[in-house]
């Protein structure tokens, strides 16, 4: 049999199961928004706990919280950050667009934990009040966007950047000895002039290097925090200097360069910084899609495709075709990239709907951004472990395709002209003979002249 306690808010009393620490507003949200199962991301909850910890410290230093209250809030946030109350943050993304109910969920749980410590009884509003103490000098309108920025930075630094560095290092290590492997290039999915396998992979390496640079550039605005703007950006009910001191506390706690936003009206009404950051995630997805698809194409086969790369064989690929092995890591990564691109569309639409003084698409913005970060991070690490590290060049196939390519004829342009070189290529293709044989047949070059000019090793820059 479940036990219940009575909590109350401005709408009256409501029953809450005794084992939970949340209060009336959280319970109402649970009952009013039974929409989907997409809960607020755990790292956003952590960001809110960090926010409340730092706010309580500043309020104490400003003389607005007595020591007992501030200390109890501080201890409660520590316990939340240690993961002790994970089941007490049950709200879904599909709620008020300001994130008010999740902000109050955090306020109520912190107050309840603190009150249990001070009175041996959870819940209630005394001696620690969720609004008057935990939320002091704050509004959901500045607290939730602040938590959005903190969560984005933490997820990026803890998950995405390490994953991309892992991929970068693996690509560099894998390709460093491939500078002598000369293969045929392809443009428009047609044969082109030669390059080395290392040169081909250097393009992928640079894409990832640029991705890391883009992240750092896009984070510059995400480091700016809305806290202190309160309801509409005017800082009503917040003391002068609270915003600056708060940002310093968050920076100190997280070891990240957070600062107070210079214009709080922009920070509440718009989320351009996060839309821009989502655009960076979208660009990274574009880069990864290209890299993964190239590796898939180069590894196609084993007998009837390009077959220039051997991809690791991780599991059976077909329920009907015995012995078939598929590029499953590539498929997983490219599906993630598709999801991230879709997430960016959602973030773009949500960001464009910041009406007047408050954008009320905040939960869906941060949900999609954090999902994109998580999916990209996990899929990249999986791709590295189960694909990139096991890539091996198929030297025999690479040499065979290179030597058969008609586009080696490009080396003849400076010597016999474009038109004559084209005649050789067409003649070779039409009759299924080599370029050398076609050049001799057309009386344009001797075998000796051809061998002196058409040297793949001299065509790679």
From Swiss-Prot:
Substrate binds at residues 98-100, 129-132, 139-141, 187, 319, 324-326. Pathway: Carbohydrate metabolism; tricarboxylic acid cycle; (S)-malate from fumarate: step 1/1. Its main location: cytoplasm. The keyword Lyase applies. Keywords: Cytoplasm, Lyase, Tricarboxylic acid cycle. It is found in: Cytoplasm. Residues 120-140 are annotated as: Disordered. One of its GO terms (molecular function) is fumarate hydratase activity. Disulfide bonds: none annotated. Coiled coil: none annotated. One of its GO terms (biological process) is malate metabolic process. Pfam families: FumaraseC_C, Lyase_1. Its EC number is 4.2.1.2. The record marks 331 as: Important for catalytic activity. Gene3D superfamilies: Fumarase/aspartase (C-terminal domain), Fumarase/aspartase (Central domain), Fumarase/aspartase (N-terminal domain). GO terms for cellular component: cytoplasm. It is an enzyme of class 4 (lyase). Belongs to the class-II fumarase/aspartase family. Fumarase subfamily. Involved in the TCA cycle. Catalyzes the stereospecific interconversion of fumarate to L-malate. HAMAP family: FumaraseC. NCBIfam families: fumC_II (TIGR00979), PRK12273.1 (NF008909). There are 2 substrate-binding sites: the catalytic A site, and the non-catalytic B site that may play a role in the transfer of substrate or product between the active site and the solvent. Alternatively, the B site may bind allosteric effectors. Homotetramer. This is Fumarate hydratase class II. It comes from Rickettsia felis (strain ATCC VR-1525 / URRWXCal2) (Rickettsia azadi). The gene is fumC.
């Amino acid at each position: 049999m479940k036990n219940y306690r009575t909590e109350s808010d401005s709408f009256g009393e409501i029953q809450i199961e005794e084992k939970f620490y949340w209060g009336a507003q959280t319970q109402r949200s649970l009952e009013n928004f039974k929409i989907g199962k997409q809960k607020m991301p755990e790292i956003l909850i952590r960001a809110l706990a960090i926010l409340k910890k730092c706010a309580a410290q500043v309020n104490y230093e400003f003389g607005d919280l007595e020591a007992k209250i501030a200390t109890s809030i501080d201890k409660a946030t520590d316990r939340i950050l240690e993961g002790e109350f994970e089941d007490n943050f049950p709200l879904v993304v599909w709620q008020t667009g300001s994130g008010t109910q999740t902000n109050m969920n955090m306020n109520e749980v912190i107050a309840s934990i603190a009150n249990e410590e001070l009175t041996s009884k959870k819940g209630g509003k005394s001696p620690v009040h969720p609004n008057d103490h935990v939320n002091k000098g704050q509004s959901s309108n500045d607290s939730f966007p602040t938590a959005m920025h903190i969560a984005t930075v933490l997820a990026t630094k803890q998950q995405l950047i390490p994953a991309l560095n892992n991929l970068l290092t693996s690509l560099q290590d894998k390709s460093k000895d491939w500078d002598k492997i000369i293969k045929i290039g392809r443009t428009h999915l047609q044969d082109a002039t030669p390059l080395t396998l290392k040169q081909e992979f250097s393009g992928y390496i640079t894409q990832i290097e640029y991705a890391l640079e883009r992240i750092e550039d896009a984070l510059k605005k995400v480091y700016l925090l809305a806290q202190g703007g309160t309801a509409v950006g005017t800082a009503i009910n917040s003391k002068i200097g609270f915003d600056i001191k708060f940002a310093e506390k968050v920076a100190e706690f997280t070891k990240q360069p957070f600062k107070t936003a210079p214009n709080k009206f922009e920070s509440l009404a718009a989320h351009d910084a996060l839309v821009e950051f989502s655009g960076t995630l979208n660009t990274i997805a574009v880069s990864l899609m290209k890299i993964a698809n190239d590796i898939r194409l180069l590894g196609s086969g084993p007998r009837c495709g390009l077959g220039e790369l051997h991809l690791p064989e991780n599991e059976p690929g077909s329920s009907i075709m015995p012995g078939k092995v598929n590029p499953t890591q590539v498929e997983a990564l490219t599906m993630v990239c598709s999801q991230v691109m879709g997430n960016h569309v959602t973030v773009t639409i949500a960001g464009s709907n910041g009406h007047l003084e408050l954008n009320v698409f905040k939960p869906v913005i941060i949900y999609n951004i954090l999902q994109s970060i998580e999916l990209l991070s996990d899929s990249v690490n999986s791709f590295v472990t189960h694909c990139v590290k096991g890539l091996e060049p198929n030297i025999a196939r690479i040499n065979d395709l290179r030597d058969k390519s008609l586009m080696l004829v490009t080396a003849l342009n400076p010597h016999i002209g474009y038109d004559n070189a084209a005649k050789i290529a067409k003649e070779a293709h039409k009759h299924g003979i080599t370029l050398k044989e076609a050049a001799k047949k057309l009386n344009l070059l001797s075998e000796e002249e051809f061998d002196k000019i058409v040297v793949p090793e001299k065509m790679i820059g």
